[in-house]
């Protein structure tokens, strides 16, 4: 395509997204840290229920806690509410010894709470996103108040990774709520109690959440009195609030980094996102049934140009669902930019009769100027080969209500531009591609039913030999590259910017916000 058309599209999109929207600011007290902890990919989830959360764990883990958690490097899984754990040699029994902890209302945390939580998480009626992922659990036993034993039906090498996201919940506070009424119960945003270093104080709808220090936290009283999470409809407003000192942290896009990197008042934090961005082809829409159409889509997009021009080179092209060298075999199709080949494939598939130039909505929850520019670039490139996409951006709650809806109309989202976690454990990608994970069981929102992909994923999930595991996930890479359930685009770096006034502040650009050991009880701020 012509560069003039490409950059014209980018300029138009940037102009459309130029106006910031500001969230109301709460009064700042001494010893308060305020941040846009849910600014960025995924945005504000619209609820505080960790069983239903697909993101936002950076914030949720400040007051809820799991049994086990990743360290802040996302390299090892360590104990959190479990002071220790062990796995039997046959990998069928997981034994957790619990730490001495209290709920925020003073009641003790016991093994009964852990069993209660896992029973909820395994019950699809609760709206849990973990039901399918925990299906290999045969039983949860509580031999005493400080011991939890999970027994599996078959080995599950990804089980610990899943458990890092299952936040413990209080039986005494939730047992009276019927499972089918739990997902959207007012408790989550009014009087939730956890075991973490901060306690829920109040939520001002769509503006902010305020937490207060938990004086009885087992790791010691937090260094600050309050922790506030501000919500911003526009990332530009969060950046303005950071510069003015209203908040001390926010996520930023790669094209904003240069404005902070040379300013000593701020610290830029960079890391691998472990999220593959992709164009999802809704398999219940006839448009995408022919593989040649999906192949044409890939050849029509100049991913290298987008990465260099818009991401500033801070992304790696993805030719399958992974980019890590150990998981990507040689000799897979790179789907090089080739608009002539794209037109040829569309002609062979009979695209003029399938759809022709009719507009096709591409739905996304990414609301940043960067992604607006990315979609404008894609739109211009695809138009050159005869595919007419029209971007539609909505907030995360609206997006989820559309793509997870049962019995909905597939034409509402024939295409999506989204991202899904593909690490640190490569099994994370399973929930978006395995046919067993089609909603309500999981997050296969494109309703993908591709036997070769499911077979490769199942084999990888079942592999218990660490030496063979990477090879199994290379097979997943091959299957997704050959069958194109998604049009995989890239894995980009992520960035956060923190005020230099923050001390002992830990933020890791983790997929879905973690969780990981951030130790918010140690965060402090220079007055």
From Swiss-Prot:
Keywords: Peptide transport, Periplasm, Protein transport, Signal, Transport. Its main location: periplasm. Residues 1-23 form the signal peptide. The keyword RNA-binding does not apply. Gene3D superfamilies: Dipeptide-binding Protein, Domain 1, Dipeptide-binding Protein, Domain 3, Periplasmic binding protein-like II. It is found in: Periplasm. Pfam families: SBP_bac_5. GO terms for molecular function: peptide transmembrane transporter activity. It comes from the Bacteria. One of its GO terms (cellular component) is ATP-binding cassette (ABC) transporter complex. The complex is composed of two ATP-binding proteins (BMEII0863 and BMEII0864), two transmembrane proteins (BMEII0860 and BMEII0861) and a solute-binding protein (BMEII0859). Probably part of an ABC transporter complex that could be involved in peptide import. Belongs to the bacterial solute-binding protein 5 family. This is Putative ABC transporter peptide-binding protein BMEII0859. It comes from Brucella melitensis biotype 1 (strain ATCC 23456 / CCUG 17765 / NCTC 10094 / 16M).
